Regions:
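Hydrophobic alpha-helical
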Residues: 124-139, 206, 220, 224-287
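Short, solvent-exposed amphipathic alpha-helices that sit
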Residues: 74-88, 169-173, 197-216, 230, ...
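Hydrophobic alpha-helical segments within soluble ligand-binding/sensing domains
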Residues: 57, 105, 161-187, 200-201, ...
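Bacterial lipoprotein signal-peptidase II cleavage site
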Residues: 40-47
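Flexible loop/hinge segments that line or gate small-molecule binding clefts
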Residues: 128-168, 179, 186, 192, ...
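N-terminal secretory signal peptides
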Residues: 1-18, 29-38
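Hinge/cleft segment of the Venus flytrap/periplasmic-binding protein
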Residues: 49-61, 190, 194-198, 209, ...
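Extracytoplasmic "Venus flytrap"
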Residues: 52-81, 85-89, 94-111, 115-117, ...
Length: 351
């Protein structure tokens, strides 16, 4: 297949090609011209490049991507999505793993900034930790797409920001949790990384909802930096400090952490007394909601954010002018009614 060739992915190789996990291969190519036209780019150029190849954006493009760390399933899903859409649309994606570490990601982005790209897309592990190399790339005329979290609190010339409403996500999933425990009891919040704007928003949403439930008491709120091993250690300590009957609920800033805590709680034989919720609606968490081991999760649409970054970055690299500075990418609270459909959309790299 053309996706394995060195000369780039061509739309003609994918038009009409359908398989179980990739019905989008034909549809994605067919829709790019309308995206380009809507953003003021030349739709005819999208169909045929200067060499006669039918690349989605007139020529093969090279992009660099980085998110917080592939140890998080949300980030791993995003990587798979960006690479898959890149193959469909003729964008060669090079990945720089953030390693769930400010220092690791900074070194990766410093290296990224030494090279030339058609566009880059970044989810920062911590706010204001990548400003200098990102400004260096912007100064070279490279469009920078910001994904999910804020790179800089100042305006440094980011092309656009694809972001979910983290406050809303934290609020709605916390409300579902408190309803599950009847509006009363003790809760623990396990945070992500304190410098991560997504985690900050989810914490704010949690506290907004907590204020509406006077009979719910917050026992502890500690960061685990998205690290499931830190989560396990924290919750082992909580279960010792707060004996049976003293914890009714746990809210986690992502699903990986919620599921890690669920294992610790189950090993202690306390799974029936503590309700848990997470954020991201990754497939294992959606299944956990369906089987009752999680009380809820809310979708942070990793696939939509990452394929959006591929498409919008390519638009910016090929002359689109009216790209908005902010694009909201919200997802729903997961219920039994929508779970199967959401899983299907994730499997197709859409949601």
């Amino acid at each position: 297949m053309a996706g394995d060739k060195d000369d780039g992915v061509q739309l003609s190789d994918y038009m009409g090609f359908i398989n179980r996990r990739g019905f989008l291969r034909g549809a994605a190519a067919a829709s790019v011209a309308s995206f380009l036209a809507a953003c003021g780019a030349n739709a005819e150029t999208a169909q045929t490049g200067a060499t006669g190849n039918t690349y989605a954006f007139g020529k093969p493009l090279k992009a660099a991507f980085s998110n917080a760390g592939l140890g998080a399933t949300w980030c791993a899903q995003g990587k798979e999505t960006a690479e898959r859409w890149g193959k469909w649309l003729g964008v060669e994606v090079t990945w720089y793993d953030g390693g769930l570490s400010i220092d690791t990601q900074r070194k990766a982005i410093d290296d990224m900034a030494t090279k030339q790209w058609d566009f880059v897309a970044i989810q920062a592990f911590g706010i204001d930790t990548l400003v200098d190399p990102v400004k260096q790339m912007i100064g070279k005329g490279i469009p920078v797409i910001q994904m999910d979290t804020t790179i800089s609190k100042d305006d440094i010339g980011i092309t656009t920001f694809l972001e979910p409403d983290n406050i809303l996500m934290g609020s709605v999933v916390t409300d579902a949790l408190f309803q599950q425990i009847g509006g009363q009891g003790n809760v623990i919040m396990t945070q992500g990384a304190l410098g991560h704007t997504g985690a900050q928003g989810r914490a704010a949403g949690f506290h907004q909802t907590l204020e509406k439930y006077p009979n719910v008491k917050l026992l502890a709120e500690d960061p685990a930096d998205w690290d499931v091993n830190k989560v396990a250690s924290l919750w082992e300590d909580y279960l010792v400090k707060y004996p049976a009957g003293q914890i009714q609920a746990g809210m986690f800033h992502n699903d990986d952490m919620a599921l890690a805590a669920a294992k610790v709680i189950k090993n202690a034989g306390r799974e029936k007394e503590i309700a848990l919720v997470g954020v991201d609606a990754m497939p294992p968490a959606v299944q956990a909601v369906l089987d009752g081991s999680l009380a809820g999760t809310v979708r942070n649409p990793s696939s939509r954010i990452h394929w959006g970054a591929v498409v919008i970055g390519a638009l910016a690299a090929t002359g689109a002018k009216n790209i908005p500075k902010y694009i909201l990418t919200d997802g729903p609270l997961v219920t039994q009614k929508i779970a199967a459909g959401l899983l299907f959309m994730e499997e197709q790299f859409l949601s």
